[in-house]
Amino acid sequence: MRDKIKLVSSAGTGHYYTTTKNKRTTPEKLEKKKYDPVVRKHVLYKEAKIK
């Protein structure tokens, strides 16, 4: 089953993306470089739980 996760910006802006991931095939935390419109740069986004 695919679980919903939140990708939070490491720039500290509070911006985030939501996506899904298959926890059985990728049990480790997801890290991805994506665009942060607040700082207008590509920064590292790290996985966090959706509350």
UniProtKB/Swiss-Prot annotation:
Family: Belongs to the bacterial ribosomal protein bL33 family.
Biological-process GO terms, alphabetical: translation
Pfam families for this protein: Ribosomal_L33
Protein name: Large ribosomal subunit protein bL33
Protein source organism: Nitrosococcus oceani (strain ATCC 19707 / BCRC 17464 / JCM 30415 / NCIMB 11848 / C-107)
Gene Ontology cellular component terms for the protein in this record: cytosolic large ribosomal subunit
A GO molecular function held by the record: structural constituent of ribosome
Keyword hit for Ribonucleoprotein: yes
Keywords assigned by UniProt, alphabetized: Ribonucleoprotein, Ribosomal protein
